[in-house]
């Protein structure tokens, strides 16, 4: 894949078989999971949970960078709860999301500034911008 003066920092590789009722494994062996459909009684996780976990982790990293740009540190007890809805639409399926963000002890305006900065720089947030209805909520 060619890039325009971009430097690839990391490439994740997974092999998935069986779709929502299959398995997914990473090339380094660190990820080896069973997949199941949401709401089924089968063991395993689903793409929506994986997306939520990845986005939460990435967003926390982006908040750290945004806080650093403001010359402050994130509170020790910060967290992100990400909800991903699988939505049935007239033309198939789509996703919508809510990121509920806790930054205890920070002034509300400062916390909102960090969240806004992270939403602009987080690779997940950038990838879904204008395609997935997303709410960023300070809790």
Predicted segments, located by residue:
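Extended beta-strand/beta-hairpin segments
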Residues: 1-53, 60-139
